[in-house]
Amino acid sequence: NPDMVFEYASTSKITLPGAGISVMATSTANLAYMEKLMDIQMISYDKVNQLRHVLFLQDKAHTLALMQQHAAILRPKFRCVLRCLEREIAPLGIAAWQKPTGGYFVSVNTLPGLAKRTLALCKEAGVTMTGAGATFPYGIDPNDSNIRIAPSLPPVSELEQAIAIFCNSLKLAALEKLGV
Protein backbone atom coordinates (compact mmCIF):
# COMPACT_ATOMS: atom_id res chain seq x y z
CA ASN A 1 0.00 0.00 0.00
CA PRO A 2 1.80 3.17 -1.18
CA ASP A 3 -0.26 5.32 1.19
CA MET A 4 1.47 3.82 4.23
CA VAL A 5 4.80 5.58 3.68
CA PHE A 6 5.81 9.10 4.67
CA GLU A 7 9.57 9.62 4.35
CA TYR A 8 11.23 12.78 5.67
CA ALA A 9 14.69 14.32 5.45
CA SER A 10 16.20 17.61 6.55
CA THR A 11 19.32 19.68 5.97
CA SER A 12 19.21 20.92 9.58
CA LYS A 13 22.49 19.30 10.69
CA ILE A 14 24.09 19.85 7.29
CA THR A 15 23.62 23.58 6.94
CA LEU A 16 22.03 25.61 9.74
CA PRO A 17 20.95 23.75 12.90
CA GLY A 18 17.26 24.44 13.41
CA ALA A 19 17.00 26.40 10.16
CA GLY A 20 17.50 23.76 7.50
CA ILE A 21 14.95 22.89 4.88
CA SER A 22 13.03 19.63 4.88
CA VAL A 23 11.62 17.32 2.26
CA MET A 24 8.91 14.70 2.27
CA ALA A 25 8.38 11.75 -0.05
CA THR A 26 5.02 10.01 -0.13
CA SER A 27 2.23 8.84 -2.41
CA THR A 28 0.21 11.25 -4.54
CA ALA A 29 -2.84 10.76 -2.29
CA ASN A 30 -0.85 11.44 0.87
CA LEU A 31 0.75 14.49 -0.70
CA ALA A 32 -2.67 15.95 -1.56
CA TYR A 33 -3.76 15.36 2.05
CA MET A 34 -0.62 16.98 3.50
CA GLU A 35 -0.94 19.98 1.17
CA LYS A 36 -4.44 20.62 2.56
CA LEU A 37 -3.13 20.47 6.12
CA MET A 38 -0.13 22.67 5.43
CA ASP A 39 -2.18 25.19 3.47
CA ILE A 40 -4.09 25.96 6.67
CA GLN A 41 -0.99 26.08 8.84
CA MET A 42 1.23 28.47 6.93
CA ILE A 43 0.93 31.52 4.75
CA SER A 44 4.13 30.99 2.80
CA TYR A 45 7.33 29.00 2.88
CA ASP A 46 10.59 30.73 3.77
CA LYS A 47 11.65 31.26 0.17
CA VAL A 48 14.76 33.25 1.11
CA ASN A 49 16.00 30.34 3.22
CA GLN A 50 15.20 27.91 0.40
CA LEU A 51 17.21 30.06 -2.03
CA ARG A 52 20.06 30.31 0.48
CA HIS A 53 20.21 26.51 0.58
CA VAL A 54 20.05 26.11 -3.20
CA LEU A 55 22.91 28.59 -3.66
CA PHE A 56 25.00 26.98 -0.91
CA LEU A 57 24.42 23.30 -1.70
CA GLN A 58 24.45 23.86 -5.50
CA ASP A 59 24.17 20.24 -6.67
CA LYS A 60 24.62 16.63 -5.59
CA ALA A 61 28.40 16.61 -6.11
CA HIS A 62 28.89 19.77 -4.04
CA THR A 63 26.62 18.46 -1.29
CA LEU A 64 28.50 15.15 -1.17
CA ALA A 65 31.82 17.03 -0.96
CA LEU A 66 30.40 19.10 1.92
CA MET A 67 29.37 15.91 3.70
CA GLN A 68 32.91 14.54 3.30
CA GLN A 69 34.20 17.71 5.00
CA HIS A 70 31.70 17.14 7.83
CA ALA A 71 32.91 13.54 8.15
CA ALA A 72 36.54 14.65 8.39
CA ILE A 73 35.65 17.00 11.26
CA LEU A 74 33.39 14.53 13.06
CA ARG A 75 35.37 11.30 12.62
CA PRO A 76 37.96 12.01 15.38
CA LYS A 77 35.18 13.07 17.75
CA PHE A 78 33.21 9.88 17.20
CA ARG A 79 36.40 7.82 17.58
CA CYS A 80 37.02 9.53 20.91
CA VAL A 81 33.54 8.69 22.22
CA LEU A 82 33.53 5.12 20.93
CA ARG A 83 37.07 4.43 22.20
CA CYS A 84 36.13 5.50 25.74
CA LEU A 85 32.85 3.55 25.70
CA GLU A 86 34.66 0.42 24.50
CA ARG A 87 37.42 0.77 27.09
CA GLU A 88 35.35 1.83 30.11
CA ILE A 89 31.80 0.53 29.61
CA ALA A 90 31.84 -2.48 27.27
CA PRO A 91 33.65 -4.81 29.73
CA LEU A 92 31.03 -4.06 32.40
CA GLY A 93 27.97 -4.82 30.28
CA ILE A 94 26.00 -1.88 31.70
CA ALA A 95 25.21 -0.30 28.33
CA ALA A 96 25.13 -1.05 24.62
CA TRP A 97 25.45 1.14 21.52
CA GLN A 98 25.89 0.89 17.79
CA LYS A 99 28.94 2.19 15.99
CA PRO A 100 27.31 4.74 13.67
CA THR A 101 28.26 4.72 9.99
CA GLY A 102 26.95 8.26 9.55
CA GLY A 103 24.85 10.81 11.32
CA TYR A 104 25.53 13.08 14.24
CA PHE A 105 24.76 10.98 17.33
CA VAL A 106 25.75 7.90 19.30
CA SER A 107 22.71 6.35 20.96
CA VAL A 108 23.65 4.63 24.22
CA ASN A 109 21.20 2.22 25.85
CA THR A 110 22.02 1.67 29.52
CA LEU A 111 20.60 -0.96 31.80
CA PRO A 112 17.02 0.04 32.74
CA GLY A 113 16.73 2.91 35.20
CA LEU A 114 20.18 4.45 34.70
CA ALA A 115 19.83 7.18 32.07
CA LYS A 116 18.41 10.04 34.15
CA ARG A 117 20.72 9.35 37.09
CA THR A 118 23.75 9.12 34.79
CA LEU A 119 22.98 12.51 33.26
CA ALA A 120 22.29 14.05 36.69
CA LEU A 121 25.74 12.91 37.82
CA CYS A 122 27.26 14.34 34.62
CA LYS A 123 25.57 17.67 35.29
CA GLU A 124 26.88 17.72 38.88
CA ALA A 125 30.37 17.27 37.41
CA GLY A 126 29.84 20.14 34.94
CA VAL A 127 28.93 18.19 31.79
CA THR A 128 25.58 19.05 30.19
CA MET A 129 24.16 16.61 27.68
CA THR A 130 20.94 16.06 25.75
CA GLY A 131 18.19 14.93 28.12
CA ALA A 132 17.61 11.25 28.81
CA GLY A 133 15.06 9.71 26.47
CA ALA A 134 15.37 12.49 23.88
CA THR A 135 14.94 9.95 21.08
CA PHE A 136 11.49 8.95 22.38
CA PRO A 137 8.19 10.78 21.73
CA TYR A 138 7.86 13.62 24.24
CA GLY A 139 11.19 12.50 25.73
CA ILE A 140 9.49 9.72 27.69
CA ASP A 141 11.67 6.60 27.76
CA PRO A 142 9.68 3.91 29.61
CA ASN A 143 12.91 2.10 30.54
CA ASP A 144 14.91 5.22 31.48
CA SER A 145 17.79 3.78 29.49
CA ASN A 146 18.41 5.86 26.36
CA ILE A 147 21.06 8.59 26.18
CA ARG A 148 21.92 10.37 22.94
CA ILE A 149 25.50 11.60 22.75
CA ALA A 150 26.10 14.44 20.29
CA PRO A 151 29.88 14.86 20.01
CA SER A 152 29.88 17.45 17.23
CA LEU A 153 30.29 20.68 19.24
CA PRO A 154 33.24 20.39 21.65
CA PRO A 155 36.84 20.10 20.52
CA VAL A 156 38.36 16.62 21.00
CA SER A 157 40.36 17.74 24.06
CA GLU A 158 37.16 18.78 25.87
CA LEU A 159 35.26 15.79 24.53
CA GLU A 160 37.83 13.41 26.05
CA GLN A 161 37.16 14.92 29.47
CA ALA A 162 33.39 14.98 28.98
CA ILE A 163 33.13 11.36 27.82
CA ALA A 164 35.35 10.23 30.72
CA ILE A 165 32.95 11.97 33.10
CA PHE A 166 30.02 10.35 31.30
CA CYS A 167 31.56 6.88 31.63
CA ASN A 168 32.33 7.39 35.32
CA SER A 169 28.81 8.74 35.91
CA LEU A 170 27.30 5.70 34.22
CA LYS A 171 29.46 3.38 36.34
CA LEU A 172 28.42 5.19 39.54
CA ALA A 173 24.73 5.12 38.55
CA ALA A 174 25.02 1.36 37.92
CA LEU A 175 26.68 0.80 41.31
CA GLU A 176 23.95 2.82 43.03
CA LYS A 177 21.26 0.82 41.23
CA LEU A 178 22.88 -2.43 42.34
CA GLY A 179 23.07 -1.13 45.91
CA VAL A 180 26.85 -1.40 46.07
Residue ranges and their predicted role:
Residues M4-R75, L175:
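Conserved core segment of the aminotransferase class I/II
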Residues V5, A95, V127:
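Short, conserved active-site loop motifs that form the nucleotide-linked donor/cofactor pocket
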Residues A9, V23-A25, K99, F105-N109, ...:
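Short beta-strand segments
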Residues L31, E35, V108-R148, V156:
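Conserved C-terminal alpha-helix-loop-beta "cap" of PLP-dependent enzymes
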Residues L55-L66, E86-R87, P91, R117, ...:
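Inter-domain helical "communication" segments and dimerization helices
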Residues Q68-L82, I94-N109:
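Conserved glycine-rich beta-strand-loop-beta hairpin in the small C-terminal domain of fold type I
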Residues I140-V180:
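PLP-dependent enzyme catalytic core of the Aspartate aminotransferase-like
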